[in-house]
UniProtKB/Swiss-Prot annotation:
Keywords: Ribonucleoprotein, Ribosomal protein. One of its GO terms (cellular component) is cytosolic small ribosomal subunit. This is Small ribosomal subunit protein uS9. GO terms for biological process: translation. It comes from the Bacteria. Pfam families: Ribosomal_S9 (PF00380). Belongs to the universal ribosomal protein uS9 family. PANTHER family: RIBOSOMAL PROTEIN S9, SMALL RIBOSOMAL SUBUNIT PROTEIN US9M.
Amino acid sequence: MAVAKVQYFGTGRRKTSVARVRLVPGNGKIVVNNKAMDDYFGLETLKAIIKQPLQTVEMEDKFDVLVNVRGGGHSGQAEAIRHGIARALVKADGELRPVLKKEGYLTRDPRMKERKKYGLRKARRAPQFSKR
């Protein structure tokens, strides 16, 4: 029989991105969709966004982070991963909740793309008006 491995799950969302995050005790490796985080995300700012919850609670080298993320663009995916990591950390240690909540990492950002309306070019952009 296999030894039960301790792991913590968290689901993060942002815009149309959904990230399923798994925290496993380890040395701080972050894997996104079976690729190293450095290969998946090119921009340093996005990598920094992902690491924020772990840095806030000083657990960067305590967990390996395994992520499966779908939908949206790179920025939305990075913020969804941040949300998922924060939720998983709370499952790992409930005492971290106030710290992460204060930083805003546990709050789901409700802003979504506004739908396009008929008669307009975009959600709010009207066609050009001509007096004559």
